[in-house]
């Protein structure tokens, strides 16, 4: 648990309090997540075993879930307008951020998606290294990629702000999932024209050291009384 709640509850609460989300579906093979999700009136999509391995790609699980949801809604004579993709291990999301992303797409029909985005200048590609055949560190990408190397230095901000899609939330139009192969790498489900939904220090939890960061974020930004 994180501050008294299961990790997967935070995105479920955010979704249930958003004024725009009409239905909640959860794709999982986990009985615990299924049980928790039903407390938030979520419909469960049974995730196939081949999509529930460490090697399975998130994009394939999203695509499977999308077509299952589409099938269910078509049987009710309904259509999908937008998909709000949330992640069981990404608690840095609120209903307000979801609403902001939806409103961005409602105002600009040329956008494919709106995703939560955070600045992480300390992890700039300028600082990234790889280990060569001799065991020494080399630039991961050529410095010329960032412009004139003479204008760059050890200041983490010297290359400008570095924005990362932080996996808190991806709000996408259906065509992004219908034709995922046309999307921008590496998160192809976001399409090509992606709007940021600005926030601070968003992340999905992959490592133990991230837990204190997420606890700080929840204490600072999580509003349990918010209704929209």
Predicted segments with their positions:
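Alpha-helix termini
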Residues: 68-77, 108, 182-188
């Amino acid at each position: 648990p994180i501050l008294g709640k299961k990790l997967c509850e935070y995105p479920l609460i955010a979704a249930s309090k958003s004024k725009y989300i009409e239905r909640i579906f959860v794709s999982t093979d986990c009985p615990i997540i299924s049980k928790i999700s039903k407390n938030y009136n979520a419909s469960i999509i049974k995730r196939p075993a081949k999509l529930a391995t460490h090697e399975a790609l998130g994009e394939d699980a999203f695509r499977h879930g999308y077509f299952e949801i589409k099938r269910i809604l078509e049987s009710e004579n309904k259509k999908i307008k937008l998909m709000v993709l949330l992640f069981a291990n990404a608690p840095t999301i609120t209903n307000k951020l979801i609403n902001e992303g939806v409103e961005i797409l409602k105002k600009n029909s040329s956008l494919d998606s709106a995703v939560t985005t955070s600045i992480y200048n300390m992890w700039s590609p300028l600082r990234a290294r790889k280990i060569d055949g001799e065991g020494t560190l080399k630039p991961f990408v050529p410095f010329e990629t960032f412009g004139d190397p003479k204008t760059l230095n050890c200041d983490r901000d010297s290359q400008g702000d570095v924005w990362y899609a932080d996996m808190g939330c991806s709000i996408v139009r259906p065509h992004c999932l219908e034709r995922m192969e046309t999307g921008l790498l590496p998160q192809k489900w976001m399409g090509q024209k992606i709007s940021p939904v600005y926030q601070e220090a968003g992340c999905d939890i992959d490592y133990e050291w991230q837990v204190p960061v997420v606890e700080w974020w929840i204490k600072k930004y999580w509003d349990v009384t918010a209704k929209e």
